[in-house]
């Protein structure tokens, strides 16, 4: 099996795990467990807490002491146990702590997946800019497949969605141990920053990187809103008679999955845009795309305004990919191998935590 196929499997499962619950869990907690809006928001805020702390710490461990692919696998195995426990939760406190523990080990895997992929592609003399986006697009396909699976089976309204996530996380955790070794960097004459694993913080000394991380924080805030409340927002139209039986209400998760379908197209366009416009222009395009995303989503409805909702989903693909994937590639190019995992962890901490 070629290295590209092996990485495709990894990326597919990585986002299948997330897609099995990320979009639909809020609706399940609101409609079936009767959690209040503030409680749902607090549970999803654990994603920010986990992103603020863990990616950097796990990245440091991968850079200094532990093979990244093994650490990646362990995180998913622990995450599988947490999701299984979350599936049994019926109260707010249970669900909060279960999802916090799950996200503490899941969020670091987003950056570790990139580190493992980049390392494997470099080992096999592949071109990152050319070869990584077509591999990463399978992560989005995995996310879409998970969303459709939980919607069409009716799992979006039950704890079964968490069982799906737990099983797929366990499979990925075991599979990860078969991937090419991504060993810690062995450096001599370590500085004080290196000794404490804080190497990536030196990137803030460079004006270009400091500005990049600032905008990453702002765009990262926009990323979380529809993930948390999108399904609940569309489900709220069920209270309006003319929209109650509409496709957008009955199959809200499938409607939201158009966003991820759009991602698959824009991921493939990233090499072209980076080559012809550069990272600054690509990130600027992303900023404008986010404005249109929320404007269309806010004014649309499942009836005559369905076209605005659909267009909003399509624009999301550009907004997300041009920010998230291009940003990760930019960090990879601007850092050396000794701090690469730490730098990727820092990037995800800023975009998903702050």
Regions found by a protein language model. Give the residues of each.
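Helix-loop boundary and gating motifs at the non-cytosolic
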Residues: 1-48, 208-243, 251-255, 324
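Hydrophobic core of transmembrane alpha-helices in multi-pass small-molecule transporters
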Residues: 12, 82, 92-111, 116, ...
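Central cavity-lining transmembrane alpha-helices of secondary-active solute carriers
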Residues: 42-60, 254-269
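Cytoplasmic membrane-interface "Motif A"-like loop-to-helix N-cap segments
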Residues: 63-76, 275-287
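C-terminal ends and interior cores of transmembrane alpha-helices
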Residues: 77-91, 288-302
């Amino acid at each position: 099996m070629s290295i590209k196929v092996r990485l495709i499997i990894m990326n597919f499962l990585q986002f299948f795990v997330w897609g099995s619950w990320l979009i639909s869990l809020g609706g399940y907690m609101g409609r079936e467990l009767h959690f209040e809006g503030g409680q749902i928001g607090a549970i999803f805020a654990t994603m920010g807490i986990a992103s603020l702390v863990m990616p950097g710490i796990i990245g440091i461990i991968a850079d200094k002491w532990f093979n990244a692919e093994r650490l990646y696998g362990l995180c998913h195995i622990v995450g599988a146990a947490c999701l299984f426990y979350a599936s049994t939760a019926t109260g707010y406190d249970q669900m909060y702590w279960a999802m916090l523990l799950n996200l503490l080990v899941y969020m670091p895997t987003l950056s570790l997946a990139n580190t493992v992929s980049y390392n494997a592609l470099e080992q096999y003399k592949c071109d990152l800019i050319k070869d990584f986006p077509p591999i990463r697009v399978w992560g989005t396909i995995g996310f879409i497949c998970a969303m459709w699976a939980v919607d069409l089976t009716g799992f979006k309204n039950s704890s079964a969605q968490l069982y799906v996530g737990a099983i797929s996380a366990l499979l990925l955790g075991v599979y990860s141990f078969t991937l090419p070794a991504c060993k810690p960097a062995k450096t001599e004459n370590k500085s004080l920053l290196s000794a404490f694993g804080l190497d990536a913080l030196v990137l803030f000394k460079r004006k270009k990187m400091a500005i990049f991380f600032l905008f990453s924080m702002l765009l990262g805030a926009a990323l979380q809103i529809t993930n948390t409340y999108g399904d609940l927002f569309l489900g709220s139209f069920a209270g309006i008679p003319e929209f109650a039986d509409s496709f957008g209400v009955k199959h809200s998760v499938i409607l939201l999955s158009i966003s991820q379908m759009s991602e698959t197209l824009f991921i493939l366009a990233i090499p072209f845009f980076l080559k012809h416009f550069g990272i600054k222009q690509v990130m600027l395009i992303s900023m404008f795309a986010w404005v249109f995303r929320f404007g269309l989503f806010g004014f649309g409805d499942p009836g005559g305004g369905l076209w605005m909702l659909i267009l909003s989903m399509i624009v999301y693909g550009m907004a997300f990919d041009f920010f998230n994937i291009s940003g990760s590639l930019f960090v990879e190019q601007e850092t050396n191998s000794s701090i690469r995992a730490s730098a990727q962890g820092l990037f995800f901490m800023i975009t998903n935590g702050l």
